[in-house]
Amino acid sequence: MTFGSSPCLSSEWGHEYFRKIRSFFEKTGMDVFEHDGSYSGDPCASTTHAFHKGLEDSQWTQRSMLEDTYKWMRATGIYMNVPDMGTMLIGSSKCGVGYREVNWSLPRDRQIILGRQNIFDGTWKRNPGDGWTFTPLVQYHGGGAAATLEPLDEHLDAYKAHMIQNYGSGVQSCYRGFRLYDTDRTKEAVKEIIAWYKEHRDILNSDIIHLRRPDGRDWDGIMHVNPSLEEKGFVMLYNPTGEEITRTISLPLYYTGLTRMARISERGGKARRVRLDREYNAEVKVTIPADGYTWLVIK
């Protein structure tokens, strides 16, 4: 068995399962489907199931039934989150960016670095909006209090760090817990970060240029680019160390569409004009606070 113990989708049970799913969406008008665990089904050796002959055709027929449902959903305009990259070709809208669930039992500071590594590694071949990541607000698998964000107000810095790097990358996260805020202070932090994301949503959902992979030893960062927007670039830079750092960073601006000059501002401040070199790079000097971040807008 591939998945341990999956029921056969090409049985009468499976046929009824798909019929009920379609009926539910037709009658309720819901337009989002979260489907975790269908995939292609385990091989099934039954010779009495109504929708396959035996072992040899069992996975093929199960896959076909799944494809029919997904294609119908796509044609109907239903948005599908399915943790299987292979289903992107048959209608699903989003897949996991790539993470191991047990790693969310690590201490909070390691989860933050791990989250950025997952995003960095998972956005080479697809847009940030094609994947989701994970943020465990309560204990997940294990790790105890050291791995848990709850109570959110007591661990607000770590909570904000997760939100900033998730929204700042354009990769939406599944926040696993019972609430998004537990105090007025936490609520204001959530509202502030979401408002920041909405202000820059178009560029934050654009393609990513990878600047430096997170390693916990020095700065890391990514840059969104889109030559069709007023904000043609958006840079997220992080400092995982316990000390403030100042670095001169070369930004590859070719895919912003800029050719000679760029106007670059930090954290919404006054823009400065920077000349691009012959390879369309622009050098910027930035100071990143300890265990913190900064961001640049390029026009």
Where are these regions (language model features)?
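Aromatic- and acidic-residue-enriched carbohydrate-binding clefts of CAZyme catalytic domains
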Residues: M1-E12, Y39-T69
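Active-site-adjacent "subsite" loops/lids of carbohydrate-active enzymes
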Residues: M1-T28, Y39, V102-N118
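Conserved structured core elements
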Residues: S11, H15-F18, V32, E56-E67, ...
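A structural motif
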Residues: G29-M30, V171
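Conserved beta-strand positions
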Residues: M30, H35-G37, V82, L237
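Short, solvent-exposed turn/loop segments enriched in Gly/Ser/Thr/Pro and often Arg
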Residues: H35-D42, D84-L89
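Active-site-proximal substrate-binding groove within the catalytic cores of carbohydrate-active enzymes
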Residues: M65-A271, T287
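C-terminal beta-strand-rich structural cap/linker in extracellular carbohydrate-active enzymes
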Residues: R275-K299
